[in-house]
């Protein structure tokens, strides 16, 4: 028989801080240079034209424009930003027609 009560240790009692990953700006939304488009773990989304990628795989805009998502392959996606000049020209063409 034990002289002292055995002290157990809890395997719970820890919780990690939230990382707030995910898409921050969706397709068709206007972004300015430096805006974060999405935060991710690894490269599910790859940077396209006018888009940069940080050391933690954060994808951000390099120019002012509109966000555009596209399929790179069956599993991978590509994120582009269409600059403002091109967006304005397309709007003017629609208004004239």
From Swiss-Prot:
GO terms for molecular function: structural constituent of ribosome. The keyword Transcription regulation does not apply. GO terms for cellular component: cytosolic large ribosomal subunit. Keywords: Ribonucleoprotein, Ribosomal protein. GO terms for biological process: translation. InterPro entries: Ribosomal_bL27. Residues 1-21 are annotated as: Disordered. It comes from the Bacteria. Belongs to the bacterial ribosomal protein bL27 family. PANTHER family: LARGE RIBOSOMAL SUBUNIT PROTEIN BL27M (PTHR15893:SF0), RIBOSOMAL PROTEIN L27 (PTHR15893). This is Large ribosomal subunit protein bL27.
């Amino acid at each position: 028989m034990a002289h002292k009560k055995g002290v157990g240790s809890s395997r719970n009692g820890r919780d990690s801080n939230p990382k707030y990953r995910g898409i921050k700006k969706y397709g068709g939304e206007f972004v300015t240079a430096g805006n974060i488009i999405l935060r991710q773990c690894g490269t599910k989304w790859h940077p396209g034209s006018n888009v940069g990628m940080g050391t933690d795989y954060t994808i951000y805009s390099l120019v002012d424009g509109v966000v555009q998502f596209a399929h790179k392959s069956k599993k991978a996606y590509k994120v582009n930003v269409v600059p403002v000049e091109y967006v304005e020209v397309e709007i003017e063409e629609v208004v004239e027609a």
